[in-house]
Structures are given as C-alpha cells and as structure tokens.
Amino acid sequence: MQVSRATEMLDAEFKKWREQPLPEPIKYPLLDARYEKVRREDNTVVDCTLLIAYGIMESGRRCVLGVSVELSEAEVHWRKFLESLIARGIHGLKLIVSDNHVGLKAARMSVFPSVPWQRCQFHLQQNATAHIPRKSMQQEVHNDIRDVFNMPTRSDAEIQLKKLIRSTEKRPRTCRAGL
C-alpha cells in the first residue's frame, strides 16, 4: 500500500472519530495545546498548534475527546474547537481545567460562560518556575507549590500558600513573578 493511500484512509477514519458523538457524559474536560512541526502538501514544514481536549468520564476513566491542528492558540481556533465538542454532545460540565492562555480563556468564557474553571496545576508550576534562574531553586519552588495542592483541606492549603508567598518575599522579584 502506498503512503498516500494509507494517509487517505487514516484521514477518513480520523475525521469519522472527530465527528462521532462522545462515548459517555463528560463532566471535567482538560484543555491543552502543544506545538508541532507539520509538513504541508507543498513539502514545506510549518509550526502548528495541536489543540487537545481530554475528558474525565463519570466512570472516572480518562479519554481523548478531540484534537485539532491549527495555526495558533488564538481565540477563534479555540472557540471553533470547543464548539465542535458541543456538537458532539458535551454539556453539563462541572469544571474546566486548562492553562491560562489568552485565546483559550476568551474562547472558554464565550462558549462556556457559567462553567467554573481551574488552572492546570502542571502549567501553574511550569510558569512559576520559569521565572527562577537556578535549577536548585526551581525544584524547591516546584515542591512548595506541590505541597499546597497536596494539602488535605482547603484551609490547610490556604495556610500553606501563605507560607509559600511569605517565603518568596526573601527571593529576587523575578522569582516571585511566576507566583
């Protein structure tokens, strides 16, 4: 089988998957994006954004809800992607988890204005430690943030967060920028 024929078949199957109804109710979507090099039909290679939606089903299982290759994380692309999930049956969401990217935030607020949102813990830690110049300090701050998330109660987490904020007052301003 030729590569072009295999690609056509794969594209058809992928399109069918992207348009099928969701397998069961999703209450907690996790939205993310990654950047990939993509070869176009004219053989040029361009940077593209892969928008990804994962879901946590009522059964507790995780699944990939959808993916879309776009030019950027602009609001228009995220909005189109979120609307495609609605067309496939996503509704009654309890919480959306994602990074705080400007385009995603605007699209999320436009498409799901009343659904609560939580910033992704992984991205929060990444963004916070990106402002820290030394690797040893990065790991320390990463662990401190993780401790906040791992507290058994909200009040314990708030106390731990206050300690973390106080501890950053002794650090350079660039270190505090990510928190």
What are these regions (language model features)?
Residues 5-97, 102, 106, 110-114:
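RNase H-like nuclease fold core
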Residues 106-179:
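Extended amphipathic alpha-helical interaction segments
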Residues 2:
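Residues in the helix-turn-helix
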